[in-house]
């Protein structure tokens, strides 16, 4: 099956160049020239890889990365003329998987796409299922089920649940969680972590009231996944 690539770029010359080059490599290519179209194409076409320019006419690409990451973990390669170190760091922190600056080499881009595809394939093949009482987590498909009901989580919520389940019974400090989820330790992210945890607990408990008790808060220390106990 052909991999699907979505190009989000308002420069039609670059879009055409990428479309031709990637189609010759047997990719199924779709395009969007603004953020509004991009959201629609992501929802309808469900691409395997996104190529994103930051200078879109209706929204800054950095904001778009964050919005995309609220509902999907599709790999994103940024291709931008912006070369500032802080911009590159922010794009990666917001959820981009890779960053290339313009002008760029098409063959190098092809190679980076292949790397991302190999990583995605290896994750799919690691089809490990974790169970804890009525909770079931499929790490390969990133699906969560409680009491035969699917739980729809954001990428950050899933990462948080995955981390806790991989260390079931162990108290994970806030610092460790921040490092694993965000890639760095910054105490300013604590409110964001608490919001993700609150939302995660609410979604789990909507499927079964006992689910809220499997994650324990240790004040000023961190969180711990406990064994499921039905009341």
Curated annotation (Swiss-Prot):
Listed InterPro entries: CheY-like_superfamily, OmpR/PhoB-type_DNA-bd, Sig_transdc_resp-reg_receiver, WalR-like, WH-like_DNA-bd_sf
Null mutant phenotype: Inactivation of kdpE results in decreased transcript level of cap.
One GO cellular component term: protein-DNA complex
Protein name in the entry: Transcriptional regulatory protein KdpE
Upper classification of the organism: Bacteria, Bacillati, Bacillota, Bacilli, Bacillales
Post-translational modification, as annotated: Phosphorylated by KdpD. Phosphorylation is required for transcriptional activity.
Cross-referenced Gene3D superfamilies: 3.40.50.2300, Winged helix-like DNA-binding domain superfamily/Winged helix DNA-binding domain
GO biological process: regulation of DNA-templated transcription
Keywords associated with the record: DNA-binding, Phosphoprotein, Transcription, Transcription regulation, Two-component regulatory system
Species of the source: Staphylococcus aureus (strain NCTC 8325 / PS 47)
Function (record text): Member of the two-component regulatory system KdpD/KdpE that regulates the transcription of a series of virulence factors through sensing external K(+) concentrations. Also regulates capsular polysaccharide synthesis. Upon phosphorylation by KpdD, functions as a transcriptional regulator by direct binding to promoter regions of target genes including spa, hla, aur and geh. Represses the transcription of kdpFABC operon.
Induction field: By the Agr/RNAIII system.
Gene Ontology terms for molecular function: phosphorelay response regulator activity; transcription cis-regulatory region binding
DNA-binding region, residues: 127-227
Residues modified as 4-aspartylphosphate: 53
Domain Response regulatory span(s) in chain numbering: 4-117
PROSITE patterns membership: OMPR_PHOB, RESPONSE_REGULATORY
């Amino acid at each position: 099956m052909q991999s699907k690539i979505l190009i989000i770029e308002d420069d039609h010359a670059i879009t055409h160049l990428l479309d031709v080059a990637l189609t010759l490599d047997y990719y199924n290519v779709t395009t969007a020239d603004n953020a509004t179209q991009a959201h629609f194409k992501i929802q309808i076409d469900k691409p395997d890889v996104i190529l994103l320019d930051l200078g879109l006419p209706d929204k800054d690409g950095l904001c778009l990365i964050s919005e995309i990451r609220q509902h999907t973990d599709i790999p994103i390669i940024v291709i931008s003329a912006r070369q500032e170190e802080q911009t590159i760091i922010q794009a990666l922190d917001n959820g981009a998987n890779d960053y290339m600056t313009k002008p760029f080499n098409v063959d190098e881009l092809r190679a980076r796409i292949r790397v991302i595809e190999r990583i995605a394939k290896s994750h799919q093949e690691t089809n490990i299922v974790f169970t804890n009482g009525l909770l079931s987590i499929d790490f390969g498909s990133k699906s969560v089920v409680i009491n035969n009901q699917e739980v729809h989580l954001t990428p950050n919520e899933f990462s948080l649940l995955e981390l806790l389940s991989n260390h079931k019974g162990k108290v994970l400090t806030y610092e460790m969680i921040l490092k694993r989820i965000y890639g760095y330790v910054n105490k300013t992210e604590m409110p964001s972590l608490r919001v993700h945890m609150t939302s995660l607990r609410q979604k789990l408990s909507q499927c079964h009231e006992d689910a809220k008790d499997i994650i324990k808060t240790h004040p000023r220390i961190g969180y711990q996944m406990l064994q499921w106990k039905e009341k």
